[in-house]
Amino acid sequence: MLDLTNFDRIRIGLASADHITTWSHGEVKKPETINYRTLKPERDGLFCERIFGPTRDWECYCGKYKRVRYKGIVCDRCGVEVTRSKVRRERLGHIKLAAPVSHIWYFKGIPSRMGLLLDMSPRALEKVLYFVSYIVTNPGDTPLFKKQLLTEQEYREFRDKYGTDFQAAMGAEAILQLLDEIDLNELAAELRQEIRDVTGQRRIRAIRRLEVVESFRKSQNSPSWMIMQVLPVIPPELRPMVQLDGGRFATSDLNDLYRRVINRNNRLKRLLELGAPDIIVRNEKRMLQEAVDALIDNGRRGRPVTGPGNRPLKSLSDMLKGKQGRFRQNLLGKRVDYSGRSVIVVGPSLKLHQCGLPKEMALELFKPFVMKRLVGDGHAHNIKSAKRKVERVRPEVWDVLEDVIKEHPVLLNRAPTLHRLGIQAFEPVLVEGRAIQIHPLVCTAYNADFDGDQMAVHVPLSAEAQAEARLLMLSTYNILNPKDGRPVTIPTQDMVLGIYYLTIERPGARGEGKAFRDVNEAILAYESGVIELHALVKVNMGDGRLLETTVGRLIFNEAMPPEISYINKLVDKKELSLIVDRCYRRLGYKRTAELLDGIKQLGFKYATQGGLTIGMNDIVIPERKKEILGEAESHVEMIEDQYRRGLITFDEKYRQTIETWNRATELVTQELLNTLDRFNPVYMMATSGARGNIQQIRQLAGLRGLMADPSGRIIDLPIKANFREGLSVLEYFISTHGARKGLADTALRTADSGYLTRRLVDVAQDVIVREIDCGTDEYVEVGDVRDGTEIIEMLQDRIVGRTAARAIVHPETGAVIVDADEEILEEAAEKIVAAGIKKVAIRSVFTCKTRHGVCKKCYGRNLATGRVVDIGEAIGIIAAQSIGEPGTQLTMRTFHTGGVAGEDITQGLPRVEELFEARRPKGQAIVAEIDGLVEVREVKGRREIEIRGENGERVQYAIPFGARLKVQNGDRVEAGDELSEGSVNPHDLLKIKGPAAVQQYLLREVQRVYRMQGVDINDKHIEVVIRQMLRKVKIDEPGDTEFLPGSLVDILDLEEENRRVEAAGGSPATSKSVLLGITKASLATDSFLSAASFQETTRVLTEAAIKGKVDPLLGLKENVIIGKLIPAGTGMNRYRSVEVDPAVETPAKEVPTH
């Protein structure tokens, strides 16, 4: 077996026949599998014990040797080695092929590697390999030329004419001979010369051929290894055969495919021994080739081989591919023991760091711990009797269980786990019943509710795992959301409503204006019924000042930490969030957890005491509604009349009608808000942020308003009724369009958003904080992000928690606000904005020079903790989750914007995808390529723009029909400016203005989509992904470097190679920046394991094998695949080598657990 600790890279290559034979434990000669009577494997068959090892531990086939004491002996009767049966998962067999066959990956892949090496078209190659045409291998003294194809007829004619002067053959043997004759060094030199001499298509073809030749040269692979003479047979446990109830067998498809190969191979051997006619042998060889093709990649060429019911059989390639393939099913996601799942219910009495675990579940999960403790405490003599006690659930077991779970955190996970807050650690509390109890405040992070959601529980076993769960994953440490650094564990719904009710004031309430000596007296007066909860009273706060406040606010402030000043205002959800944030920043995790529990108790208590429920009478319909709608109707009739008389067009009529109804809806809403009492529960729920919004109240008590039809166009007939009055049939029908579209959209959105997250994770997974400072001099200047005149994101939000690249000085006083290389804190950011500074130079992930990751200075603050990021933090994954998780909230398809003549602009999720995949946008804007003056003119009925540059150069652009211009005659433009409305093609921008402009453009556009939906994401997450999209450059002229023209190379690799060449006096390579979409960037990574487990598995592995690629195992994914600890967090080498020195004794300190 692999020893996972002592290797740090893994290489893939082509295997020669000798390699395969040395790895193999024996040749599979027969197609038999298992004897149906004895149910034992047949000798020399596909499950043979002599080749693959015994089916039972320490027992040979014939039963002569049983028991572990014969370990390692090979039985003299049956030839089976006495060993563990699990060797049947790792021992390889082989089939010696009677004729060479080609490997379909290298012949059929795009581009065909064999075809490029031999300079043959894939079609010609196919004719030779499948015995349709002959190929000349040695023309001798004839007018034929090497690699010329001959049909059967031509071959016969030339044979008659020239006899044995030339050699021609067909099948894989002929190709094998040609591949053996290739001199790679000579061919490489010829191709380099050709690249210098020719242009156009021929040059491109030469470059592609040189790439393959160089791959073979560097990897020490021989081209002839693409033709197989020995076929490996994978271990039998990986292609199992099991007996079903009815005595029938269920088997893996691979066994069928191997059986076909063995049958055809044995038939071919027999035919060759018999000296059968050429045509029969040829047919058998072709069938063998096809059988091997089907085994390796069924369906790649021709029709796939099907099993019962016309189902294509799953070949070796299919075993690796897709969600059910080896990579994604077994290597990246495994089943976990010590886990369970159950329905969740609310546990309002739990503390923030606790969860309620059902007793039966806890007993099963902690079974080994309980058994060990039972033996240790003397309740049982040995493990066996302890196990019996647990299974029979004796009374003493419960006491031991109570003891065992103390201080032993468990992990709770809710699918879908969209971000790191989807798994958190809690201390379990045993509860009756069979449902897991969840603290109400962690529901937001999990996006959980109690309508039947289920959650999974996992038990961390080792001491290290428990320590990590407690110190890093405990729910009290997950108060901030990693995507924007704001609190995510904040009271919601009934708690918000309760606090709102508690802190609201009611003018004229009983006891208003009374004064009290201190807080206690005021509360006593309330409890005695002298004053009401909401009455404004004066209270002496102990420092001599009388404060006008309400008893409710006094009670609320009792729950506040003394360090936070008295909160004397109506507290809604926003205010609560600010309070939690302030408490966390000033007082830390523990005190915030206590505060949250306090607010939770108060909220529930007063929501109950206030009796805040909804009844029909709470929905009050405004009296003026009829009047307002009457006025609107008469106005619409007037517009209709104008249209009939031909005074306005249909479009104008439509637009004016919609404006009229919108105005009417707005008036009704205003009336409604004026009508509702401030203590009306419906109104309170909406204004406090507990549930619902004004729009929903409007539909309940006002009117439903305008609706959209299936295409998204607004129907100009509004629904005048509201839900309290009830809808007519027509009104109900109109409103179903939107409802159905909403449901369909949600379903699509979830899938699309999940796929986007997967691609983002893949592109950024190896971005880890690797060092403190990369030492770069480069920086990025940031200011407010604007969309026209509207500010999308303010300067202050953009610079908090970032590192200043240069000292930031007050423009008037000259005082230094922040030093260079220092973190910009909240107070400093406020000072910077107050000083009127509009642009700030900060360190950014964009300009970080750290290899395979980023440095602490360029990244800045870790938003999940509010402190500077630690080395080893997997910020790439966090970035991907932060962008992907809100993706589900973004709307789908395109919006029809009123007024723009039929122009759709892509918005929401599709726009984010378009940006990250660097696609050409729909409705593309024309971009100026040079600086100069604009002239708009009409030529032959079409408009065009001409830009006249300073030095006389002119560029013309044709304007597509219906495009709206952003510039006018005589305007001055700079390169990169948009000339027409629409989205800019990022590739054009990269060509014209360079990488920095593209980075800022993509950042701005992605932020714009999220901000429109009211989602806040910190810039740095988007920067991490964009940086990964711009990692590569395309080589123009390789100079004296090792690179090939047109190849994609990492920027840092290019700089390093250029330095090496220049030091040796050579000429460096020149290159141009390229922008890769996230899918392309993921596949262009250094790690072939990561790329293969993402998409296009066979293509990635084919290329990697030919290049003999080495995977340096730097990312997370490739380490998960081979089962090593990930090189992030506590899995980093710098943390792994820490050893505890027991020599120094320190007195134990009492550590309170929450």
From Swiss-Prot:
Annotated family: Belongs to the RNA polymerase beta' chain family.
Any GO BP: DNA-templated transcription
The protein's name: DNA-directed RNA polymerase subunit beta'
Annotated cofactor note: Binds 1 Mg(2+) ion per subunit. Binds 2 Zn(2+) ions per subunit.
A GO molecular-function descriptor: zinc ion binding
Record field: catalytic activity: RNA(n) + a ribonucleoside 5'-triphosphate = RNA(n+1) + diphosphate
EC number assigned by the record: 2.7.7.6
EC class: transferase
Function: DNA-dependent RNA polymerase catalyzes the transcription of DNA into RNA using the four ribonucleoside triphosphates as substrates.
Coiled-coil region: none
Nuclease keyword on record: no
Annotated source species: Desulforudis audaxviator (strain MP104C)
Subunit note: The RNAP catalytic core consists of 2 alpha, 1 beta, 1 beta' and 1 omega subunit. When a sigma factor is associated with the core the holoenzyme is formed, which can initiate transcription.
InterPro entries named in the record: DNA-dir_RpoC_beta_prime, DNA-dir_RpoC_beta_prime_bact, RNA_pol_asu, RNA_pol_N, RNA_pol_Rpb1_1, RNA_pol_Rpb1_3, RNA_pol_Rpb1_3_sf, RNA_pol_Rpb1_4
Residues the record lists as binding Mg(2+): D449, D451, D453
Binding annotation for Zn(2+) 1: C60, C62, C75, C78
One GO cellular component term noted in the UniProt record for this chain: DNA-directed RNA polymerase complex
One Pfam family this sequence matches: RNA_pol_Rpb1_5
Annotated residues for binding of Zn(2+) 2: C774, C848, C855, C858
Keyword terms, alphabetized: DNA-directed RNA polymerase, Magnesium, Metal-binding, Nucleotidyltransferase, Transcription, Transferase, Zinc
Named cofactor requirement(s): Mg(2+); Zn(2+)
Alphabetized SMART domains for the sequence: RPOLA_N
